[in-house]
């Protein structure tokens, strides 16, 4: 049963990771390379689909179940009774989610970026600006995965309904509220990723200019959020009453 659940998660992650690539290839093959299609590629596919949707969902699937086996088997007590610092227990769990999520999503974002958009465009013009854009997408996605992983690993220890919590958080806070209230972007993982994306290549991602926070604020915000939720996870593990 557990192997089936793991296989289902991996299949879901693979499908979600392939979705931007497939859509990007379709758009690149059917639409003309003009400013309008470039804006649509950035706002709809990169932001709306990858960064706002697929990135948090994939990371949620991985991170909320970081301690799932131990909680299900009631073996978490064996972990916490070991004479090792709690952060050394949390860190490998967090890193596992980050590594798997980053590989899938960075490849997805990079290939989609090479295939779609005008100046971001085809592989044949990879040296004409699109390499920088691809690297920017990779870094922005990585930052998003790391930050979300810290939040959702903590959620997996705090509540047995971590996935429900994560979905509400992603679609309400990251999706709806941050889209209408500009100040919320300073407390939004999506806002951090978009600001880093634009900050690393403001020419290719110029359509984002009016709705991103400052690049330094995004870097600091992502780092602080990751550190805070890592600390909260360690603290939660230390205080848990495990059977």
Where in this protein do the model-derived segments appear?
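Secretory targeting signals
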Residues: 22-66, 90-159, 178, 196-201, ...
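Juxtamembrane non-transmembrane "cap" segments at the membrane-aqueous interface
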Residues: 174-200
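Aromatic- and glycine-rich beta-strand/loop motifs that create alpha-glucan
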Residues: 1-14
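Alpha-helical transmembrane segments of multi-pass membrane transporters/translocases
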Residues: 203-243
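Short cytoplasmic-facing helical segments at TM-TM junctions of multi-pass membrane proteins
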Residues: 75-79
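Alpha-helix N-cap/helix-start motif at helix boundaries, enriched for small hydrophobics
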Residues: 87-90, 237
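Pore- or pathway-lining transmembrane helices of multi-pass membrane proteins that form conduits
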Residues: 11-16, 159-178
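Short helix-to-coil transition segments within interhelical loops
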Residues: 80-85
């Amino acid at each position: 049963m557990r192997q089936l659940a793991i296989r289902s998660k991996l299949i879901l992650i693979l499908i979600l990771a392939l979705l931007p690539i497939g859509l990007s290839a379709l758009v690149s093959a059917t639409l003309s390379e003009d400013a309008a299609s470039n804006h649509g590629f950035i706002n709809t596919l990169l932001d709306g689909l990858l960064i706002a949707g697929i990135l948090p969902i994939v990371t949620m699937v991985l991170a909320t179940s970081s301690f799932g086996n131990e909680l299900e088997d009631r073996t978490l007590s064996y972990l916490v009774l070991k004479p090792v610092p709690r952060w050394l227990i949390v860190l490998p769990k967090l890193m596992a989610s980050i590594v798997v999520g980053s590989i899938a999503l960075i490849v997805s974002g990079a290939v989609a970026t090479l295939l779609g958009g005008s100046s971001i465009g085809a592989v044949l013009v990879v040296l004409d600006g699109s390499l920088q854009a691809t690297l920017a997408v990779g870094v922005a996605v990585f930052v998003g995965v790391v930050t979300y992983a810290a939040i959702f690993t903590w959620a997996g220890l705090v509540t047995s309904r971590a996935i429900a919590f994560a979905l509400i958080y992603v679609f309400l806070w990251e999706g709806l509220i941050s889209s209408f209230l500009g100040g919320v972007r300073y407390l939004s993982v999506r806002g951090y990723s978009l600001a880093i994306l634009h900050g690393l290549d403001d020419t290719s991602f110029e359509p984002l200019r009016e709705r991103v926070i400052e690049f330094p604020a995004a870097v600091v915000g992502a780092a602080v959020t990751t550190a805070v939720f890592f600390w909260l996870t360690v603290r939660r593990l230390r205080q848990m009453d495990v059977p």
